[in-house]
């Protein structure tokens, strides 16, 4: 069983699980996370270092940092213009169930219902087999899900490339202030995670898989980090029946961003959506089946496809919860 210890950083005491790290640049094994961050050891193969700054383990490779510079600049401009985040600590405590800012209440209503469904109907199935669980929170944002999981005594690790103090990993300080054992914050990309193989029980894509530029590569990397029998969970990524429906959505959004912000927000060729044929192909690639859960988001959400059909608009996305199951579980 993993344990934790107290590591001093600029932001105070940070409790880290005993995890093995590998270099995000060359994949060479580095050793224990606590030793690597305490001593800022360089990779013996390529010289890359994973350091701890403001309580965040900086594990984005140099080439990754360069690749995402423009994306992060544009993404941050959009998010700040939309009024994401808050200076009020209470805002973060209310997530995902309430948006105290009132600026994105409908979006958080969906996020809240997705997580409520996951927490009440899906997570207990995993907890019967093992608890606490070691969990990758992929696309953790401000860390709200890791906080909720930590309250259930699990061991989450929050992963994101956005470290913004209002909207990214930097905002997790509000959650850390209330926890005796703080969950680790790791700046890293999905396709090059700094963890050795087989250390986690769940890999949860937290409204984030659609940011992947290559689903095969991203899901293969998540599976690498999982123990035998570990599960991939996909929350709040848009799913369309047909590919062309998602492509129409993407074209609409690019036009909207160009008009509103002066750029299309496509510097990174993210996939942006899933569709049913792609899910089938990804299941074959991974050697799994997707168990599909469909939370109830209310009548307004339920009637969206009918309204779209009557008005001649493209079919809207669906937000399913997808959980990977090995094919052996169906025999």
Report residues per predicted region.
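A short SAM/SAH-binding and catalytic strip from SAM-dependent methyltransferases
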Residues: 202-214
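N-terminal auxiliary segments of SAM/dcSAM-dependent transferases
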Residues: 2-86
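Class I SAM-dependent methyltransferase SAM/SAH-binding core
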Residues: 136, 142-192
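Short, low-complexity, charge-dense intrinsically disordered segments
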Residues: 327-331
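A short glycine-rich, Lys/Arg-flanked "PGG" loop and its adjoining helix->strand segment in the class I
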Residues: 216-231
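Conserved class I S-adenosyl-L-methionine
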Residues: 54, 58-129, 148, 233-257
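A short acidic, Gly/Pro-enriched loop at the edge of an enzyme's catalytic core
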Residues: 191-203
């Amino acid at each position: 069983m993993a344990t934790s210890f107290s590591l001093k950083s600029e932001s105070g005491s940070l409790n880290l699980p005993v995890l093995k790290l590998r270099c995000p640049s060359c994949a060479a094994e580095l050793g224990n996370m606590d030793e690597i961050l305490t001593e800022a050891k360089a990779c013996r193969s390529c010289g890359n270092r994973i350091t701890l700054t403001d309580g965040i383990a900086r594990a984005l490779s140099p080439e990754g940092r360069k690749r995402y510079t423009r994306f992060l600049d544009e993404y941050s401009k959009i998010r700040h213009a939309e009024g994401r985040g808050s200076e009020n600590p209470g805002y973060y405590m209310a997530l995902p169930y309430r948006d105290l800012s009132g600026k994105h209440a409908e979006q958080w209503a969906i996020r809240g219902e997705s997580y409520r469904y996951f927490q009440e109907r899906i997570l207990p199935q995993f907890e019967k087999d093992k608890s606490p669980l070691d969990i990758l929170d992929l696309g953790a944002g401000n860390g709200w899900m890791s906080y909720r999981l930590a309250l259930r005594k699990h061991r989450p690790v929050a992963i994101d490339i956005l470290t913004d103090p209002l909207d990214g990993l930097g905002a997790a300080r509000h959650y850390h202030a209330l926890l005796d054992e703080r969950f680790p914050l790791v700046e890293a990309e999905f396709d090059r995670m700094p963890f050795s193989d087989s250390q986690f029980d769940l890999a949860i894509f937290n409204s984030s898989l659609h940011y992947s530029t290559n689903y095969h590569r991203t899901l293969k990397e998540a599976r690498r980090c999982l123990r035998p029998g570990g599960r991939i969970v996909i929350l709040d990524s848009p799913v369309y029946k047909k590919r062309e429906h998602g492509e129409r959505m993407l074209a609409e959004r690019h036009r909207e961003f160009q008009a509103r912000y002066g750029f299309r927000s496509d510097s990174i060729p993210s996939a942006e959506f899933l569709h049913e044929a792609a899910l089938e192909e990804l299941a074959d690639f991974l050697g799994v089946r997707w168990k599909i859960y469909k939370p109830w988001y209310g009548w307004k959400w339920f009637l969206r496809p009918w309204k779209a059909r009557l008005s001649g608009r493209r079919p809207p996305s669906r937000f399913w919860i997808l959980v990977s199951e090995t094919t052996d579980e169906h025999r």
